[in-house]
Amino acid sequence: VTNYFDVGTAQDWFEYNDKPVFFCDIDGTLIKSQTRVGSNTYYDPPIVLENNVKIMLEYQSKGAQIIFTTSRPKSVDHITRSMLESLGFKNIQLISGLLNSKRILINDFNAGNPFPRAEAINLFRDDDLLKNFL
């Protein structure tokens, strides 16, 4: 047998496979939705969706990679990064300035592992029940 990656025991495999890559929206997902103008802007202290943040921090502490995505303009990246750090997130990767429209994840899978490796979760805005989907 050649060209394989030995992850050890079945338990080792489950731990290795339990390190997903998340593309996670911020507003309405980790904090109550903030906007450029109005009563709850990017400049105001966030109203944290505690349960959602907790589960994402748990995944990150186990080695999951989180790439934060947002329609917030790049001009407020420093505010966004600071807010994410204050929530406890580390190694922040941020994609900002996205269109406020449908987001589509495209990924491949192969015959050696015929199970689809891409998933999508749609939460109601400001819903704090992410753990029910993970």
Task: Give each language-model segment a name.
Residues K19-L134:
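HAD-like aspartate-dependent phosphatase fold
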Residues V1-K19:
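Conserved alpha/beta core of the MobA/IspD/sugar-nucleotide pyrophosphorylase nucleotidyltransferase superfamily
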